[in-house]
Amino acid sequence: MKSENNSVPIDHVIKVDNERHIRVWETFPKNQCDKRNNTIVIASGFARRMDHFAGLAEYLSTNGFHVIRYDSLNHVGLSSGEIDQFSMSVGKKSLLTVIDWLKSEHGIDQVGLIASSLSARIAYDIVADVNLSFLITAVGVVNLRNTLEQALKYDYLQMEIDEIPEDLDFDGYNLGSKVFVTDCFENNWDTLDSTINKTKNLNVPFIAFVANDDSWVQQHEVEELMSNINSDKTKIYSLIGSSHDLGENLIVLRNFYQSITKAAIALDSNLVGLVSEIIEPQFEALTIATVNERRLKNKIQSKSLA
């Protein structure tokens, strides 16, 4: 892993079963002298590609972090598969594959995980079984059934699987309903209780960010999850003025970047909280990173179509 241009991520390909692959982007610390103890893995939410988190990667790398992003299998983005075949278990497999790749192929054992929205539910599922340094979630789903009901305006999980419409629109994409719902029931992804059971023995430092105007994730359910964790290394913070869409405007987006970075720096130093100061990337640097990533994505997509 070597970088010659810190404004362009390094593109990696992890081969998985049946000639499929997971695409990974790696961003190095801007100043090697100030690099942190942990590598950060960012798990994007549903219908979000890794390039949607260019700004967060820029904030974290400006503040000394080595950052890894990836696109899940059967999802939007550059990895194999189509989003109408996505399931929570496929998302789990993708995240575990990336973490194992870091550890086995590159000897990186100190890993902090940042997961948003639907990917947070996946993070909650693996956190007790994977050797992480810390976990940060943002608008993290804890009650998948309730979130789906809020997003889809109806509780489709009460229906027989054969009766569920196959072309449900979830956040602008066609959710392969039968694949997704079957996996939810077979692998216990759907309830708040299932999430609590997965996290009650969590023993790594954990900070959860909720949004005070989030109709998809209920703050009291996140608080219930936290209260059932047998650890004193947890905290919850509110992103004031935000809905579930953390990119709805520049003020909300900047607050999200700042808050996550403050939490990551604190947790990297074994403190459960937020540091008071961070280095703010220049607007020009954020713009350059975004443009370069868009070009890289287009280049990769063009090659795959050739």
Swiss-Prot record:
Record-annotated active site: S117 (charge relay system), D214 (charge relay system), H244 (charge relay system)
InterPro entries: AB_hydrolase_fold (IPR029058), LuxD (IPR003157)
A Pfam family this chain is assigned to: Acyl_transf_2
Domain of life (superkingdom): Bacteria
GO biological process, one term: bioluminescence
Pathway linked to the protein: Lipid metabolism; fatty acid reduction for biolumincescence
Presence of the UniProt keyword Secreted in the record: no
Keyword GTP-binding found: no
EC number: 2.3.1.-
Keywords, ordered alphabetically: Acyltransferase, Luminescence, Transferase
Gene Ontology MF annotations: acyltransferase activity; acyltransferase activity, transferring groups other than amino-acyl groups
Family stated for the protein in its record: Belongs to the LuxD family.
Biological role stated in the UniProt entry: Acyl transferase is part of the fatty acid reductase system required for aldehyde biosynthesis; it produces fatty acids for the luminescent reaction.
Protein's UniProt name: Acyl transferase
Organism: Photobacterium phosphoreum
